[in-house]
Curated annotation (Swiss-Prot):
Family classification: Belongs to the cytochrome c family.
Keyword Metal-binding among record annotations: yes
Subcellular location: Mitochondrion intermembrane space
Electron transport among keywords: yes
Major site of localization recorded for this protein: mitochondrion
Function: Electron carrier protein. The oxidized form of the cytochrome c heme group can accept an electron from the heme group of the cytochrome c1 subunit of cytochrome reductase. Cytochrome c then transfers this electron to the cytochrome oxidase complex, the final protein carrier in the mitochondrial electron-transport chain.
Signal peptide positions (record): none
SUPFAM superfamilies the UniProt entry points to: Cytochrome c (SSF46626)
Pfam families given in the database record: Cytochrom_C
Binding site for heme c: C19, C22, H23, M85
PTM section of the record: Binds 1 heme c group covalently per subunit.
The protein's name in its UniProt record: Cytochrome c
Length: 108
């Protein structure tokens, strides 16, 4: 099964509620508790310049795509054991798809 079609506006709401306290998405945006996410699609884990990642994130060695984000966001600590991201994950497939649709648009 592929990823369901996502709704950007609904994804924006999820981002504001669940992600924005630790992450920014705009180009040149600051790192907060978590790294700025601009340009995340096609980038390897643990590679945003100037952010202090855990070794787990640096050594995971995958590239962020819709598919890897979809799996990661369901259960971050299972996907990258040792990550310091405290987010428990989004179990709802549609919510993950919406969030990814928003990220795809906003991090370019």
């Amino acid at each position: 099964g592929g990823i369901p079609a996502g709704d950007v506006e609904k994804g924006k709401t999820i981002f504001k509620q669940r992600c924005a306290q630790c992450h920014t998405v705009d180009k040149g945006g600051p790192h907060k508790t978590g790294p700025n996410l601009h340009g995340i699609f096609g980038r390897a884990t643990g590679q945003a310049a100037g952010f202090a990642y855990t070794d787990a994130n640096k050594s995971k060695g995958i590239t962020w795509t819709k598919d890897t984000l979809y799996e990661y966001l369901e259960n971050p600590k299972k996907y990258i054991p040792g990550t310091k991201m405290v987010f428990a994950g989004l179990k709802n497939e549609k919510q993950r798809a919406n969030l990814i649709a928003y990220l795809e648009q906003e991090t370019k």
